[in-house]
Amino acid sequence: IKFCRDKRKVANVYLDKEDTCHHLTGYITACNDDEVLIAHINTRGEYDGFVYEYASNVYRVDYDGEYENKIGTLYKLKHQSHPQFEPDEENILFSLLKFAENSKLLVSLEDEENSVTGFLKSFSDTQIELETVNEYGKYSGVTVIDLEMVETISVDTDYEQDVKLLADNNTENGSVC
């Protein structure tokens, strides 16, 4: 993982031994012994936000293969880029959350069975509080979740971008998001 970060290589990061078709593709933005932050790129070689994972969930990393090279080439040919921010290598998660909060980006928190999406209200060493927004961009309450229950955190992926567009549209049209 560190090699891919240091050499700026597009990597495929695998998290589920039971489902090898599911992987995250992109540049490793930051990593340490416990955390990995991926500047995610979709299957069309386009910007797809950031995905945070616990390093212990990663069981395989591929790089320099045909697929990774294709995605990297498309990303360059399409003049794609990720917003620049300098995550603190000692605390990648909080760097990402501060970036999302300051940029007013939607965040999705996933556990084994569920996911919740929303705007950050607050966060601490033990929990995250979101103003939740449903898939239609409508405000749906407040969720407080224990960080120990969260497996994956996504910021500004295609899904969050679409929901944010809907939420912004609802707000502009006088609806409560």
Could you describe each region identified by the protein language model?
Residues 1-23, 37, 42-113, 134-177:
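Short glycine-rich, low-complexity segments
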Residues 22-29, 116-122:
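Short beta-strand-centered aromatic/proline hotspots
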Residues 28-36:
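N-terminal mature ectodomain segment of secretory-pathway/periplasmic proteins
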Residues 35-38, 126-131:
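Short aromatic-glycine-enriched beta-strand elements
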